[in-house]
Amino acid sequence: MTSSAPGNADGQSRLAARFVAGPHVRAPDTAEHRLQDWLAELEPSLAASLRDQFASGWARSILLGIVESSPYLFDLIRADAQRLDRLLRCDPQTHLAELIARTGREVFACSGEADVMSLLRRLKSEAALLIALCDIGGVWPVMQVTAALTDVAVAAVQMALRHLLRQEAARGRLAPIDPAQPELGCGLFVLAMGKMGAGELNYSSDIDLIVFFDPDATTLAHDIEPQPFFVRVTQALARLLQSRTADGYVFRVDLRLRPDPASTQVAMSTEAALHYYEREGRTWERAAMIKARICAGDVAAGEAMLAELSPFVWRKHLDFQALTDVHDMKRQMQVYRGHSEIAVEGHNVKVGRGGIREIEFFAQTQQLIAGGRHPELRVRPTLQALDVLTASNWITAQARDELTSAYEFLRRVEHRLQMMADEQIHSLPDDVDGVARFACFFGYESRERFATDLLFHLDIVQGHYARLFEGDPTGTVSLPPVNYGAGPDEPRLLEHLVALGFRDPMMVALTLQQWLAGDYRVFRAEATRTTFNEFLPALIDGLAHADEPDRAVVAFDRFLQALQLGGRLITLLGQNRDLVALVALVLGAAPRLGDMLARQPRLMDGLIDPRFFGAIPDKRELSTRLAATLQDAGSYEEFLDRLRLFGQESLFLIGTRILSGTVSAQQAGTAFADVAEGIVHTVHNLVIERFAAQHGRIRGQETAIIAMGRLGAREMTASSDLDLILLYDFDADAPDSDGERPLQGAHYFARFTQRLISAFTSRTNYGVLYDIDMRLRPSGRAGPLASHIDSFAHYQEHEAWTWEHMALTRARVISASPAFRARIEAIIQTALRRSRDAQAIARDVADMRRAIAAEKGETDLWDLKHAAGGMVDIDFVAQYLQLVHAASKPEILDISSLQVLDHAERLGVLPRADAVILRHAARMYHDLTQILRLCVSDKFKPDQAGDDLLRVMTRAGDAPDFSALEARVRETQSEVRRVFTALLER
């Protein structure tokens, strides 16, 4: 059965005998049972062969670890047991080379696209399993793993492109020089960028490609226009590689690193590209081109273009602007990423502090600085760059060795994370148990041992990164003596401001003159003026470090004008000068937060608190802080005002962390919800006591607050209102309250609810707590404000519309006695778990989506909630899946759409490909929505937005620039709408 397999080996050269490592299995009995169940389903001789393979040392541990921790790899194993047997008996390096070569021959022999797609996907599946086994089993070092992944990707792109060009030649549109190699002289070439270009692909990586063509050097038929022809070929190439079929996909293709992707075609002429890079090319594009490599197509045309691009990437002189660009890249990472504490749970090993990106940036920065004059630095792989930098005496051998060790460790962590579900993720689980499970899959016996090694490497990387510029480790400069109050007529001041990076030095000089004149309200106190004058040079330097220095000055000026008592704040900034750039970011990108800081300067205390950039406080810590805030409140009004201040401070601090990039959207949404939940529970209890003091209590009374919508799902934003339902119960035999001003039954609870709403929405000098929306109560506006629990149960069973049960999937009791909570949760579960007609629910959900589109519109790309393919589509898919499947699969139920998608995939009611698309989209929408809700009060219009906001959004969307982000959003919405339509509008 296996003797003729490619790469077949005997004895100690076979893969199963070469394993030297493996996972630590947490529940071996459970994993063993699942493995044996699968083996029992196989043909007996095949099962016996596999059992023989598993007897080899680490082989059983690896298979059990996969069974326990990697649904993706176990799916590959179960899909083709003979393939696993073949791989365990092969010499892996020989097998992979022969697999690629054989697939190339088979693709060449094909004429049909479907057959080519199937062959490429079978290549990817077999290679993915083989490479994973070599990685998990320690057979290959991690950089051999990345090289193998890259070889597969390059081969797949080459095979797909060659097939497409041969098809075009058969149609008479191309006259190739060599029919067997139609890419020769065709004019089109494909650049592999990023990790693919450097031979460093990660396990579940997208492939970043740029496609160019030389219209003056093609083999096209005389009547064929180059641009539309090559655009069509490029689109077909992407489709061949990334379309999901029954065999899966080959690689997700990202074409957005091309110049101005939002407004250019997927294939660009070399002339247009060179024109763009010459006139508009940015530092990040220079850095990206360091790793660019021709991976397919017309190699000669590609080499000619890269030669022309060389002066753009490799500057011959370290001119002032180049140094400024390098410093800006470094400072931007410090401002947006650098304040976050190194952590274990939730830490992003790619872009988090001490992560892979910092190692890559460490190397690329010095390559950009010196590569023009030192050609030996022009290498693509990160570790090779570190070697060359060491040989050239740019870094020490110790730095090279420590960074190499850290890079290899972090890349292995990244791979193991991605192997679990074939998703391009980089963050460790958010909870301790999740990290413990991952640590075992990674081969550690405990979370603690893994955490020790992880933190060691992260600390090492952080230290080297911080010392990147030895003469200027903090990003500050020596400030020369300058008369900052001299005004715009002083040449020395203007020269100094230009040197700092200001583009409008006259405006800045005039503003400084106004500050030093002391006419602003905040400067009335002499002590404040003195402190500010001493702080001004450092302030100007700090503002110069902002992304847009001139805008930062304008924003800070507006802030100073709004301040009333700002002496302490100015003192704090003077003592914590590293926060100036962060405050400038807040003022420029989120005027709402700036206004809050101007009204309440004490909010700055939270930024200085060492805990600010640490872990987000959990519910218990929030409860402790809330209790301390409310201690000794002298009156009901003071109590509510302290709550308002607590809410504003929480919003400000969480919002600042969103802008600085030190919390994820999910963490922010949970934090906003935890704050709101704590406040709701506190206000609920306060109003109960206050109301009882006036009207007494009814025997057996109970009240509960149910959170719906974003609060229920724990996905709140800075501008979320609270969707609430209030339920009550009492002894029907004694409906009157026992107070001085008694009320009866339903009237008592209606008045109570009005008092509760008033506590939240009454406006004082400190604003409001929250806006309240109770329209999701039974019968909506037509129903009473508060509902009896029996009425609620009857309504959900007999009267509720489908959309109301959709909303109920997010219902969460957030304030009630334990017994009353349990009764309500039972009612909700009963309503959600009842049997439903899938087609009827699909029609209802689709009708509801169309109704929302008619009311809200769905054509605004940046209405991430309501746009076609936006968050509503994803939420509706999740809610549909719950309503249809909860009767037979109650474990699908969850308040979070992301969790529902995970459950649905695991339960087999949502294809993995669709789940991946929806999960990735939801995470991106959450990331961007958090920023938009924080920074924009109306519709977001990019052409009217400030550069600070666009820059923050670009980073949140993990895009190189806003144009690329816009293209990504558009493509994502198209994919989501396709999934929605296929599922609900069949």
From Swiss-Prot:
Its EC number is 2.7.7.89, 2.7.7.42. Keywords: ATP-binding, Magnesium, Multifunctional enzyme, Nucleotide-binding, Nucleotidyltransferase, Transferase. Residues 1-473 are annotated as: Adenylyl removase. One of its GO terms (molecular function) is ATP binding. GO terms for cellular component: cytosol. GO terms for biological process: regulation of glutamine family amino acid metabolic process. Its cofactor is Mg(2+). It is an enzyme of class 2 (transferase). SUPFAM superfamilies: Nucleotidyltransferase (SSF81301), Nucleotidyltransferase substrate binding subunit/domain (SSF81593). The keyword Transferase applies. Involved in the regulation of glutamine synthetase GlnA, a key enzyme in the process to assimilate ammonia. When cellular nitrogen levels are high, the C-terminal adenylyl transferase (AT) inactivates GlnA by covalent transfer of an adenylyl group from ATP to specific tyrosine residue of GlnA, thus reducing its activity. Conversely, when nitrogen levels are low, the N-terminal adenylyl removase (AR) activates GlnA by removing the adenylyl group by phosphorolysis, increasing its activity. Belongs to the GlnE family. NCBIfam families: PRK11072.1, PRK14108.1. This is Bifunctional glutamine synthetase adenylyltransferase/adenylyl-removing enzyme. The lineage of its organism: Bacteria, Pseudomonadati, Pseudomonadota, Alphaproteobacteria, Hyphomicrobiales. The gene is glnE.
